């Protein structure tokens, strides 16, 4: 793993989580310290943003977001001093036994799910209190190319276990389960050597299969419970957090360090089929990250954020990495599987590989007809976009992409219906 120096400028979008966007707490011209809170929102589902370098705020303006669109961002000119902000002191031993103190620290440190979903961790744990009896830490890391979790386990085993212990205490539980695929035996052995039982943690070696790292698959593997269509993990008494989220909890509580960096993987044929694992500050533009890896061997045709199966397409190299960026993959024609006229040949492979036992070929058909009633009937909203159907489709149908689009359409329809209902209610009030 390589720690890369932060860039001359960091670009910090105010939206790095699911929920309410943050609002800037600083103005252009302000000097900020590394770790200083620079944006926040009091809404329950939100997480503050912190300066990842010290320096001067030179802009607060729309900038490219890694997930698309232009999003308000705070731009800081790095003074290369890393002058620390000391607002978050390490928790005392007494506070580390207090669930409320831990939850408040997780929230103030801006910690969100590092597995990609970016759900605010404090809200997730708090929402499970009284409902959840099982805390699972996801160490499967089943996506090809990605190695950040594996390296975190090897480099910080004891810190990880302490972070899991804190999450367990905050959840009001006596035990947590750390699910790790058996292809990471070196990390499993290292964690076992640290006596995880003293932290209330049980290491659970898991079979190596995709998509073992999906939240619902982790729950099934460890508890044999199944999340029903439309249900949530808390509905079966479970909460799942990622490896790097647990490490971020450790740093926030033991070091007083808010969430300002993570380990990510850079790889792909455009990088000469080399893989780089970098500890990188949030707000670092992709172009700078590529430079630190020696540049492209070939110009990429596709940029993927995350893994090749469940990752999202990015289009702008000036977009920065954010809290949920587990990897950046740069692909050329070598990996391009698209065809001009994809055709379903009714082979049924998509039915056999779907871990949720959905029927992708029918979901795809009903999407083509914009048949929302039947899309819902066939549980299209329960697809967690693992990509298994697309990968195995001999007709090269863009199944996973289609289902992602369908979810956006459902969300848009719901927003329209809500707006119409609110407008009708206002109209009724004026009569």
Model-identified regions with their sequence ranges:
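Short histidine-centered loop motifs in beta-beta connectors
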Residues: 22-31, 35
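Acidic low-complexity segments
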Residues: 64-119, 129
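Gly-rich Lys/Arg/Thr-decorated short loops/hinges at beta-loop-alpha junctions or inter-strand turns
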Residues: 83-85, 113, 135-149
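Hydrophobic alpha-helical positions that pack around
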Residues: 174-286, 292-297
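Ferredoxin-type iron-sulfur electron-transfer modules in oxidoreductases and energy-metabolism complexes
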Residues: 326-341, 351, 355-431
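N-terminal, Lys/Arg-enriched amphipathic/low-complexity engagement segments
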Residues: 1-25
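Short hydrophobic beta/alpha edge segments that flank linear recognition/processing sites
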Residues: 33-46, 61, 72-78
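Conserved hydrophobic positions within beta-strands
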Residues: 55-57
């Amino acid at each position: 793993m390589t720690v890369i120096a932060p860039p001359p400028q960091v670009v910090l979008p105010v939206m790095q989580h699911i929920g309410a966007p943050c609002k800037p707490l600083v103005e252009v011209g302000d000097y900020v310290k590394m770790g200083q809170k620079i944006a926040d929102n009091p809404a329950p589902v939100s997480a503050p943003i912190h300066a990842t370098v010290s320096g001067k705020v030179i802009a607060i303006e729309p900038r490219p977001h890694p997930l698309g669109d232009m999003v308000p961002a705070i731009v800081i000119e790095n003074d290369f001093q890393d002058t620390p902000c000391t607002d978050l002191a390490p928790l005392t031993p007494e506070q580390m036994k207090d669930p409320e103190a831990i939850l408040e620290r997780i929230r103030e440190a801006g910690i969100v799910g590092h597995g990609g979903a970016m759900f605010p961790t404090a809200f997730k744990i708090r929402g499970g209190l009284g409902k959840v009896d099982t805390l699972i830490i996801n160490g499967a890391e089943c996506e090809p190319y990605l190695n950040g979790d594996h390296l975190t386990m090897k480099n910080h085993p004891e810190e990880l276990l302490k972070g899991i212990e804190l999450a367990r205490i905050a959840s009001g539980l006596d035990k947590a389960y750390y699910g790790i695929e058996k292809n990471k035996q070196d990390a499993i052995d290292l964690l076992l050597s640290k006596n995880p039982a003293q932290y209330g943690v049980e290491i659970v070696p898991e079979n190596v299969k995709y998509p073992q790292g999906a939240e619902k698959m982790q729950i099934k593997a460890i508890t044999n419970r199944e999340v029903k269509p439309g249900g949530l993990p808390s509905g079966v008494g479970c909460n799942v957090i990622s490896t790097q989220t647990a490490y971020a909890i450790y740093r926030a509580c033991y070091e007083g360090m808010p969430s300002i960096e993570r380990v990510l993987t850079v790889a792909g044929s455009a990088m000469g089929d080399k893989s780089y694992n970098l500890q990188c500050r949030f707000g670092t533009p992709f172009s700078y990250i590529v430079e630190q890896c020696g540049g492209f061997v070939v110009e990429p045709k596709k940029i993927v954020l995350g893994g090749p199966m469940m990752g999202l397409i990015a289009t702008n190299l000036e977009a920065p990495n954010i809290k949920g960026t587990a990897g950046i993959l740069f692909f050329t024609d070598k990996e391009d599987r698209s065809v001009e006229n994809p055709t379903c040949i009714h082979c049924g492979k998509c039915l056999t590989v779907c871990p949720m036992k959905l029927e992708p070929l029918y979901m795809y058909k009903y999407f083509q007809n914009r048949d929302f009633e039947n899309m819902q009937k066939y549980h299209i909203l329960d697809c967690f976009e693992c990509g298994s159907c697309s990968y195995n489709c001999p007709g090269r149908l863009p199944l996973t992409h289609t289902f992602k689009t369908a979810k956006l359409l459902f969300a848009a329809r719901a927003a329209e219906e809500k707006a119409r209902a609110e407008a009708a209610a206002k109209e009724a009030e004026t009569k």
